[in-house]
Amino acid sequence: MEFCVLFGGASFEHEISIVSAIALKGVLKDRIKYFIFLDENHYFYLIEESNMHSKYFAQIKEKKLPPLILTHNGLLKNSFLGAKIIELPLVINLVHGGDGEDGKLASLLEFYRIAFIGPRVEASVLSYNKYLTKLYAKDLGVKALDYVLLNEKNRANALDLIGFNFPFIVKPSNAGSSLGVNVVKEEKELIYALDSAFEYSKEVLIEPFIQGVKEYNLAGCKIKKGFCFSYVEEPNKQEFLDFKQKYLDFSRTKAPKANLSNALEEQLKENFKKLYNDLFDGAIIRCDFFVIENEVYLNEINPIPGSLANYLFDDFKTTLENLAQSLPKTPKIQVKNSYLLQIQKNK
C-alpha cells in the first residue's frame, strides 16, 4: 500500500510537522509515494524524497517549486504543457497544530473526497481545544484535572478565580501541549505565564500542578470493530517537557515500555476506548494520562501525535495498513431534483 504524507501548515508547530514527516519517511520508506508540503501561506508543494531533510527546509528551497492546487482526487499541477492532475494515494495528515489538528485540512480533504488518515472535523475541534476536551471527557465519565478558564476580559482577576494553591500550570487552550506552558510557583511568576500563554490562544487554562504524578502515554486506533493499541509509555519524568524536548527529538525508534500492573494497563485502555469512541474513527491518536492516588485522569488527547507515535507500536506498518482498510465512509448524497421537477410540472 502506498501513502502520501501531508505536512507543514500555517502553525506554531510548522517545524515540528517537518521533523515528524522526515522521521516517518525513515519508518515507511518506499511506501510513501508523495510528500506534499503545505507552507505558511497555504500553498502546496510536491517535495522530492531526496529533499526530505532539515537542511532543505531550513533554506526554504521549496519556494522555487511550482505551487499545486488541491482539487477532486488529488493536486492540480500547471505547466507550459497544460494542467495535470496528480492523483493521490491515501493521505496521512501529519500537520501538527493549526490547520492539521483544528479541522481545517480535514474539512478540505473531506470536501474534495480525498481519503485520508487523521482526525475528522468534529474530532479535531474537540481535541484541539483543551477546554472542550475536558467537557468531552467529563461527559464520557473520564476524569480530568480541575481547571480555571481565563480570557482577556477576566485575566486581571486570575488570582481571585483560581481555587487551588501554588504551584499551578498555565497553558493555552488552543496550542501544542508544550507551547506557552509554564509552571507558576509564586504570584510574581503569574504575569509572565499568562502573557506567554495568551500569545498562542485567546483562552488560557490553569490547572493544579501535582508533584510526583505518574504519567502514561497510550496510542491506538480502531480497526473494524476492535482496537489496536500501542504499548504504554512512561515519559521521562521532569517538571514538564519543553517544546524542543517533546517534539524536536525524533531520533528514537522505540520508546521504553512502562512498568505497570495489568490492572492499570486495562484501566488506561478502557479510558482510551471511551475517548476514541466513534469520534476518532480513521485516526491514530495518543492519549496522555495521569495516575493520581490510583485514579486515572486524562491529561490530553493528541489527535496527530509526532510521527504518528510509530515508536510505540510493535508493528506500526501493519497497524497503518489495517487502519487504511477501516476508514469511515462518507455517504454520497444523491441529488434528484424531484422537488424542482414537481414545481415545473405544476406550472
From Swiss-Prot:
Positions of ATP binding: 161-216
Pfam family of the protein (one): Dala_Dala_lig_N
Write out the pathway annotation from the protein's UniProt entry. Answer: Cell wall biogenesis; peptidoglycan biosynthesis
Is Oxidoreductase included in the keywords of this UniProt record? Answer: no
Bilayer-spanning residue ranges: none
Q: Which GO terms describe its molecular function?
A: ATP binding; D-alanine-D-alanine ligase activity; metal ion binding
GO BP field: cell wall organization; peptidoglycan biosynthetic process; regulation of cell shape
At the top of the EC hierarchy, this enzyme's class is ligase
Cofactor (UniProt): Mg(2+); Mn(2+)
Which Gene3D superfamilies does the UniProt entry name for this protein?
3.40.50.20, ATP-grasp fold, A domain, ATP-grasp fold, B domain
Q: Which SUPFAM superfamilies match?
A: Glutathione synthetase ATP-binding domain-like (SSF56059), PreATP-grasp domain (SSF52440)
User: Any idea of its EC number?
Assistant: 6.3.2.4
ATP-grasp domain boundaries: 134-332
Instruction: Say if the entry is tagged with keyword ATP-binding.
Output: yes
Q: Which NCBIfam families match?
A: D_ala_D_alaTIGR (TIGR01205), PRK01966.1-3 (NF002527)
Protein role: Cell wall formation.
Please state which protein family the record places this protein in. Belongs to the D-alanine--D-alanine ligase family.
Q: Which HAMAP family match?
A: Dala_Dala_lig (MF_00047)
Question: What is the name of the protein in this document?
Answer: D-alanine--D-alanine ligase
